[in-house]
Amino acid sequence: MRPIPHPGRPGKILRLLAEKYPTKEAVMSRLIYLQGQLVLPKGVEHFMSDLHGEYAAFYHILNNCSGVIREKVDYVFGARMSKEEKAEFCTLIYYPKEKIEQMTAARRATPAWYRENIARCLALARLMSWKYPASRLPGLIPARLRPVLVELLATRPEADAAQLAYQQRLLASIVQADAGAEFLEDFAALVKRLAVAEFHFVGDFFDRGGRPDAILDRIMALPEVDIEWGNHDVLWMGAALGSPACIATVVRNSLRYDNVDVLERGYGISLRPLVTFAQHLYPDEAPIRAAERAATILLFKVEGALIERNPDLGMANRRLLHCIDFRNVCAVLPSGRYELRKAYFPTIDEDAVDPYVLTLEEREILDGLVTSFTESPSLRRHVDFLYRKGSLYLVRNGNLLFHGCVPLTEDGAFREITYDGKKYAGRAWLDFCDQMARAAYLYHEQEALDFMYFLWCGRLSPLSGREVRTFERTFLADKTTWEEPADPYYRLLDDEETCERVLKEFGLSPKKGHIINGHVPVKVKKGESPVKAGGRAIIIDGGFCKAYHEKTGISGFTLISNSRGLRLLAHQKIADVRTALADNGDIESVAETVELATIHTTVGDTDKGRAMQEEITDLYNLLLAYQNGVLKPQA
């Protein structure tokens, strides 16, 4: 039904629209364009989480679009190509520059090879472009050869002999001009752009893998991307903004997992002063282990001060350094007396009233690290991007995306949290946490910077949702103290009523919406399902990082949303560029249909489509204003 326009005086919106569409013809053209787009199939969305710095696997998944390109190649070429030919063609699309160099070295990059593969790329791109309006295609094509690629895509050789001759001459001319390599590279880029319209990354680029910086560089080049911060992300964000507790934790984690390259090579942050200092303190330890011990004590000192000045964070039970009985080599906790694994604490005065006081050397090292983190250009560039494209949660196209949890009580109610005299629960708490993270970025005030550390590991943090027991795991031999109680949310994800309550809290349909989470690795090898509560919740942390492969039994998940529904891919094995070039190795995945649409979802069914509908209403009002003389169109 056509929207009912308002015939009265033109408002501000109409006057602004009239500047953009000054004639009736311009309004009509835009209306027709938008109305047509509404019935196109919705774009393909890919959801991934918990990449944890595993660049090689991510790079391959990005290039093969989680296996979608191979599926399209199978569909387009079927029995016309052998299995081996398809594998080699896919590798060419994934890594065109490297594959062309390999074929050239093997003297296989002949004119016939170029013509054949450019024609294959053309057929593949033509099929994949049908979801897009023709006017948008040029914007998806690399600029250097755009005019010829647009012409090739527009040819219809099956319809007319002249069109066939035209296409054949274009292909022959490309090879004659020695431009085959450039065209293959640009066609490969176009195919990847057509395969995925939007990427959603549900947190945690950082942690154990060695190249989160390289992952972020790749993601920054993607056209349509959003990020839902993970606890590891906000830790690094807080460190880049100058939080001493976040910095000490980042340094400790990097040392603990032998992952200092990302600091030193990726971000230009030197740990040499810390290592030199630590070697004097712990001469019998390996340099990295000594530095880890020094960073650990530094962390507990600055964490203790942070907790003391922020009682509303609810972390008082994590301030434990003063519980060490140095003479009896034990820790006296509320739960009992526990033996220490190590008894040597050279930077703590055992007779001091306050063990949290930094030594002069510790203060100098910490000040140097704060300077290095806050002045790293590459880290700042990445953190700017995380803030620009990121948020604590996102509501998009009927899905609720967030990394961790919405804090709940044991019976599934939204936990009420008091901060600075105000009470928050459910969505209001996540909104407040998002605001505090942005305040840290904008104003660098102490309270907001401290809040970033809380978001990393606080029991009531929606990004953590568990009591992180670093002190016990570091110092105590009794492993019963190591258990980290988690928020009831994680247990209640299997409960449909709870998931429906969460969806409703965020304005989504409790019967049709989906919660999409990361954070908690799904133990697929033990039979655990990532699909919870009858499909209302989907956990997509499948362990991209090699350190988690043994725990999950797979190499990660990709959730795919297209016009036909939701599909979850469990990646059993992920090739890398070397494997792909050596033997055309690829990704091996098991697909599970989470939800099958009864009718194809169109652009009009999406959030973008609803925004288009609003624009259409405004344009009809503008057209009526022109027709009724309320506004005068330009001649």
Regions found by a protein language model. Give the residues of each.
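Feature recognizes metal-dependent phosphohydrolase scaffolds
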Residues: 1-635
